[in-house]
Structure formats: C-alpha cells, structure tokens
Amino acid sequence: MENYKFSTLEYKRPDLETRRAKLAQWKAAVGQAESYSALRSLIFEIDRESCELFTQYSIAHIRHTLDTRDEFYEAEINYLQDTLPTLSGDEVALSEAIAASPFRADIEREFGKQYFVSMDLQKKLFCEANIPLRQQESRLTNEYQKIMATAEIAFDGKTLNLYGVQKYFEHPDRTVRAAAVKAYSKFYEDNEPRLEEIWSELIRIRNQMGKNLGYENYIPVGYLEQGRTDYGEKEVASFREQVRTFLVPLCQKLYDAQAKRLGIDHVMWYDEKMVFPDGNAEPASDDAFMVRTAQKMYHEISPETGEFIDFMIDHELMDLQNKPGKASTGYMTSLPSLKAPFVFSCFNHTIFDMQVLTHELGHAFAGYMAMRSQPIADFYSESTDIAEIHSMSMEQFAYPYAEWFFGNQADKFRFAHLQEALTFVPFGVAVDEFQHICYAHPEMTPKERTYQWHLLEEKYMPWRRYEDDAFMERGGYWYHKLHIYLYPFYYINYTLTTMGAMEFKKKYAENRDAAWQDYLKLCKTGGSRSYLETLRYANLANPFEPGSVERACGYAEEILLKQIAEQAK
C-alpha cells in the first residue's frame, strides 16, 4: 500500500470473536509445531494480524481525538476499549504456549531475551477480575479527555480552547498574562467537582486492580505497565532527591535572573513563560511554512531524517492545526501494518509549535526507524522511559536551525527552550511523587490530595507564586496534567529522559557524527532491550547513579549561566 493518505484509509471495526477464535487456533498450532521453522512462521503470522488489529484501533483513536464531537468514532473507541480487554486471557494463554515451547531457546537466539521479558510482563499484569475495571477506567479517562477537549473559555473577545488561551501566557502585557491564567484557572475550578470525582474513582479502580494482582495498591502495577524491569520505586525516589538537591536551586537562580530581566520583584505564575521583557521568540504564524521549514531542517540533519519527513508529508501522517473539538493533547502513535507513525498536536503559534515539530517528530522518527529495523511489532515500541530520549534529544538537535523558524529571535528561542528543559524537571518529579502519594493513601479526601500538591510545589517549585488565585494557591494546578489521569506513572519518564537529552546535547556539540550514530542506534533498537541495557548500548549514563543529574545537566547549566551573566552587563 504505497500511495495512501491517512484521510483515505478505510476503518473497519475489528471482528473480535474472529480474533478470539484465531488466538485459540494459534495456541493449538504452537503446541503442535514440530520444528522451529514451523513455530517461527506462526510467530510472524500472529505478528502480522496483531499489527492489523492495532492499526484499526489507531485509526479509530486518531479520528476520535481529531474531533471528540464525532459520535461515530466516539462510539467506536468506547466499543474497542470495552471489548479488547476481554481478549487479554486468550492473549496470555497464547504467550504461555509460546514460552513453554521446546523451541524456546531458538526463539531467544533469534529475537533476544527481551521477547520473553515482555511476555512475562503481560502474564504478570493479567487478571480476569480486572477486565471490567479496565473498561470502567477507559470510560473515566475518556470523560476527562472530553472535558478538556470541549473547553470553551471566553477571553479577548474570543471563545478559546485550552491551547488557544495558553498563547496569552506569553503576552508582553503583564495584565493580559495575569487575566489569561485567571481564565485558564477558572475553567479548572469550575470543573473541579467532577474532576475530583473522576480522580477518586480512578484511584479506587486502579488500587483494586493492584489488589486483584496480589499487591497492596496500584503502584507496582503502574511500574509493570511502564515496562520497568530493571529499577523500581527506590531508584526513582533517589532520582527525585537528586533533582531536589541540584536542579531546584539552579532553577531558583534561573527564575531570579528572569525576574531581574523583567524588572519585577518576583516571577509570578503568569510570568514564568515570559522569559524576555520585549517578548519571547515567536515562530511564523503560517502553519504550512513551519512544516515546510521542518522538512528542510530534517533533510539537513541526516539522510535518514530527510527520508522520514518526506514519508510523513507524502502520506499526510501529521495533523497539527488547532481546531474546535480537537483533543487538547499532543502525541505520536503508529499504524504498524503500514510501518507508519502518526503525529497529532494543536499549534498555537508560540515556541510550542517548534517543540511539536521536534519532540513529537522525534518520537515518530524513532518509530519509523524501529519499524524498519526490528523483525516483529513487539519491538517497534521502546519502553516508555527510553521513548522520551528520542523526542527531547531531537529538540536539541534542532538548535542550529532555529534561525530558519525564528529569524533574529533564534537566540531567544534557544535560551528559553533550554531554560524550560531544566525548569520543567522539578515539576515532572512532583507529578510523579503526587501519584505515589495518592495511590498509597486512598483514604485521603479530594481536598487533602490537592493540599498534597500544594506541599509538593513548596518542595520542588519554591519559586511558584499564584498572587491572588486562591484555587491555584491551595493546589489546583495538578488538575491540568492529563498524564495523571490517563497515563499513570508515565510522567517521570520525561525527567529521566531529560538527562539523556542533555547528554546528547553535549555530545552533539563535541562530535556531531558520533552523537548522531549513537542516536540512530537508540532509535533502531526499539524495544529489543531493557531500559538500562538500552542506555549502555547507546553510550548513555544511568540517571540513578549518585551525581548523575548534576553531570547530565552541567553543560546546559554552564550555557545558561554564561548567557545570564552576559545579559546582565
């Protein structure tokens, strides 16, 4: 299928009873396989049909998020999220049959030990009693997404969605910024009663899943779902502590310098995005220009990225414009039967647009390479703690081309972007610790949980000031972070992978070719190795080792503090 466009792809609801019957047939055939060759053929047949099933799911999911008001795709995604979990037992039974095969050693020799590690995770996570809980979970997360996607905020004489109002967070007029964040805050305050209920229900449901699997709560399940096989809560807690002791004081310095630059006593919440007194760097407001320029940039970076971006544009595998009803998120997903990534976002004509064209396309490039390098779909996607290295490193690789997007404001872009790469990390670890607290203490009331967020802001973001916004001051900021609702325990990945991205930044400055080859290795390996094995393979450091945060971020710290000193002259 060479000449397709995403818009013309046919969606066909998967026949799940046929799939169930196929799973039983494959299980029997695996047990009857008399040679590794016969078993190998079955593995590839299973892989092909699984790719097709996931591709149809992806088409439905993408089209649902493109317009959450579309009743057909809303019904389809609800149907699939209700019914697909009922196949889990059959999937696990098939995996167990493959794992018990007398040809297991042959499988491991060809596909590596990670093949069975992934199967073992699938087995550990399966519990028949959790199927209806998964269905309830999906309905609740879909409701959260719909609340966010259908937001209508009256501001500046317009009706804006959440992405639209965030553009004003960078307005040069401080009173406009303050009014914009107040309007944004009010949306969450108005919706707080239902958002509290959804979160309480998700905690209850997920903790019950954990208990059904033999755990005290959901936390160990969340780690397994993220594919974490070679580190756990202890290592993550030690990483958060490194962030608190090294990065939090550095970020305080950065915000103190920003206050001086802006001519104010303290950076308020509505000032945090305003890095320069005469305005932040803004890219072109022409979406088509941004995409054309990104295409030119990717051709400059490498032959591989040039081929990739042409593929994405030729097949219309990006939807980037902000539209009514569109989900307020950004993501990359895949259409594995086509070996095609898909990128979704909402441009708002700020430096965020540049991040989309690098971050989400960094994910997509990694998927594109893995789908062409790995033999089976199990390895097309890497563990989540590796995935964000691809995206965040691509953001750094784009720095030499900033003039193409920002003209004489390129230096502003580079400074603001690098500063945000570091100042984001304390927020990211706060999100992670918040989730640990909530699942470990389900007895907390909604107001007590929100107060815990307030305490975490004091711990990790002591510079944060909300002025007269009582809702945010008592801890309301966390409601906006959809990962807390939709992707439990994912968010720490952004902070761990920032360390890898900062390493790549330094390597790219010192030896571009060597850094690019390591990056290609990282992308091509997909999910064929564990987290720590993948880091070693790509010549990256272990972020849990003492002093790793300071070593990874030291180069960026040096750049920022040097520029701050020059700005102060």
Question: Each PLM stretch: what is its role?
Answer:
Residues 116, 120, 228, 357, ...:
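C-terminal, non-catalytic "cap/extension" segments appended to globular domains
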Residues 244-246, 370, 381-409, 417-419, ...:
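Post-HExxH zinc-binding segment in Zn-dependent metallohydrolases
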Residues 282-287, 338-358:
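Short pre-active-site segment immediately N-terminal to the catalytic Zn-binding motif
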